Regions:
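Mature extracytoplasmic/periplasmic domains
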Residues: 270-329
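Periplasmic-binding protein-like
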Residues: 139, 203-208, 247-271
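Early extracytoplasmic/lumenal segment of secretory-pathway proteins
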Residues: 25-27, 33-100
């Protein structure tokens, strides 16, 4: 089934969000909620790929049409807060930190396991009790590097960022982005007493800072630095390397020797959602082998369902880690440790690291 795509602008509390209708026909403009329509809120990138991989097949399978709202994590969470328990969203796909932040304000409800049988199929880390909704994909932190300049073993060591000969030739993520928190926790685990030892992490990062060419805040920044030869290595998410490796660039990605952490993207159902039944059906399909395989192939998402097929493009970057990241030494971070400290850590990172 070919879905139509149209864009409307929704402004909530001064925040503009793009809305796309990805369905055979649009939902009614008012009146009672439509049991055959759900609204899914997701990230503002890769929407057409997500439509092809998940939305269209879901609509064909269930007859449920899907309206897709897009926006940043923070903007979409703000919209839920403004909605006051009467959201116009049935499913929100959001990063784990923001999912936890929303739970603090009771913005999400528990996903009913009895209504989502695919939960039985996914990896244990994807259904942690800490979250009210399951993970549907995840992101691995590691080092992206020039294969002309470094070996995988060299790139895997955190001490890489302290080497005099590489001063000015490396980059690190800002703590405000996903890779940044994973990096901070990796450094804390290597040089301190665990992933939340912020004092040890900031001390070490502060020592490295003068030799760091840039603390980046987007994938475009770091990939450009690497492909243009301005740096030889950078801490990054594995997904940043996929297109570069596929295109034949002399670039690879490797997991760190120690301090391996991953972030997850969660499927959350907002408190007060109008079509919970439709939301459950969507989450169930999203976690299925069919959708997970398609999403890995088309979107590039790492699947949480072990039965899904991992495409060659992903395996070329992460190898067999994708089949079982926990067995490969990766773990998730505890949001109860991160949510209360987030503002303080971001402020300290700016003072003690990036300003040096």
């Amino acid at each position: 089934m070919t879905s139509t795509l149209r864009t409307r602008l929704a402004i909530v509390a001064g925040v503009a969000a793009t809305t796309l209708v990805l369905a055979g026909c649009s939902a009614d403009g008012g009146g009672e909620p439509d049991a055959d329509t759900i609204t899914v809120s997701t990230f503002p990138f890769g929407v057409e790929e997500f439509q092809e991989a998940v939305i269209d097949p879901f609509t064909e399978k269930t007859g449920i049409e899907v309206v897709v709202d897009t926006g940043s994590n923070s903007d979409r969470l703000s919209q839920l807060q403004v909605a006051g328990g009467q959201p116009d969203v049935d499913v929100m796909l959001i990063s784990d930190y923001y999912a936890a932040l929303g739970q603090e304000d009771d913005l999400f409800q528990q996903v009913d396991a009895s209504a989502v049988p695919s939960l039985d199929e996914i990896a244990d880390f994807a259904k942690e009790d800490t979250y009210l909704g399951p993970a549907y994909s995840y992101q691995l932190n590691g080092t992206m590097y020039s294969t002309d300049e470094l070996t995988a073993d060299e790139a895997a060591e955190w001490s890489l960022y302290s080497e005099d000969e590489l001063s000015g030739k490396v980059a690190l993520p800002d703590i405000s982005v996903t890779a940044g928190q994973l990096m901070v926790s990796g450094v804390a685990a290597e040089y301190g007493d665990g992933p939340y030892d912020i004092d040890a992490a900031l001390d070490q990062l502060g020592e490295w800072a003068p030799g760091v060419l840039q603390f980046y805040s987007s994938s475009t920044e770091v990939t450009n630095l690497l492909t243009q030869g301005e740096i030889v290595a950078a801490d990054s998410l594995s997904g940043f390397a996929t297109d570069l490796v596929e295109s034949g660039e002399p670039i690879a990605w490797t997991a760190p020797a120690t301090g391996r952490y991953m972030a997850t993207n969660r499927a959350m159902i907002p408190t007060g959602a109008e079509n919970v039944d439709g939301a459950n059906q969507f989450v169930d399909y999203l976690l299925s082998v069919e959708a997970q395989t398609s999403s890995a192939e088309i979107v590039g998402d790492l699947p949480v369902n072990p039965g899904a097929t991992v495409p060659d493009t992903i395996e070329a970057v992460v190898g067999d880690i994708a089949s079982d990241p926990v067995a490969a030494g990766y773990s998730t971070l505890d949001p109860t440790e991160l949510v209360p400290t987030r503002s303080e850590w971001v402020d300290r990172f700016a003072r003690e690291v990036t300003s040096r």
